[in-house]
Design a protein with these regions (language model features):
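Glycine/aspartate-rich loop-and-adjacent alpha/beta segment that forms the canonical ThDP
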Residues: 151, 159-227
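Active-site metal-binding loops of divalent metal-dependent hydrolases
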Residues: 94-97, 124, 186
Length: 238
């Protein structure tokens, strides 16, 4: 709850372009007013297209340049080991992002140093801004690559299922002697009929009409009512 507490767990959004999701979570947790979300990417707003640790409480690392976030997370995890602190470090990457060579240098180091306080989550939705990941520059099989660098790998069949995610985090916490990589198979645009698995929605906003349809789709599936009461049931698993 205190973003400056030395022994807090850290989270690095390596795929920094998905910052709106992080901002929403931070606002719901009380780090800044929910109303400020309406200023996203406005001139002068502190909520820009990529998270900035100097201006946004709760952000542990500025990110956006793909591939760099995991390196920062590895450094944080190593620091905890060197100072005998017990905090944990989580970092979220995209499957397109792991085409960056720096990701694998960081993974090699993390496995070599047996950083069991590090959890790497790969959002494996199979799409990136230029098209299907396996057609742009295939990083598959992802899990086997992390295993080669001495990671414990958890293959998450439904990365959109919060209960499965919570179970994976529990397993990661109980894993000793090696870092954990969670390969989360997700659906891009999950729950919105015209967005699901459509690469064109990687980086654009819906207009008013599309927004109305999207919200109705989410209400039908119950996605819009996924409450923080449900999410808080998993608060202690990290």
């Amino acid at each position: 709850k205190n973003p400056k507490k030395p022994d807090r767990d850290r989270f690095v959004l390596s795929k920094g372009h998905t910052a709106p999701g992080l901002y929403s979570a931070l606002a719901q947790r009380g780090y800044f007013p929910v109303e400020d979300l309406k200023t996203l990417r406005h001139l002068g707003s502190y909520l820009q297209g990529h998270p900035d640790m100097k201006h946004i409480p709760g952000v542990d690392m500025s990110s956006g340049s793909l591939g760099q976030g995991i390196s920062a997370a590895v450094g944080m995890a190593l620091s905890a080991k060197l100072t005998n602190d017990d905090y944990r470090v989580y970092t979220l990457l995209g499957d397109g992002e792991i085409q960056e060579g720096q990701v694998w240098e960081a993974a090699m180091f993390a496995g070599f140093r047996r950083l069991d306080n590090l959890v790497v989550i790969v959002d494996n939705n199979g799409l990136q801004i230029d098209g299907p990941v396996d057609q742009v520059c295939s990083p598959y099989p992802i899990g086997e690559k992390f295993k080669a660098f001495n990671f414990h790998v958890i293959d998450l069949k439904d990365g959109n299922d919060m209960d499965q995610i919570a179970d994976a985090f529990k397993e990661a916490r109980n894993t000793k002697g090696m870092p954990t990589a969670i390969i989360a198979h997700t659906v891009k645009g999950k729950g919105v009929s015209f967005m699901e698995n459509q690469v064109g929605w990687h980086g654009k906003a819906p207009n008013d009409e599309e927004y109305a349809v999207a919200m109705e789709d989410l209400r039908k599936e119950g996605e819009a009512s996924v409450s923080y009461t449900h999410l808080r049931a998993h608060e202690t698993v990290l």
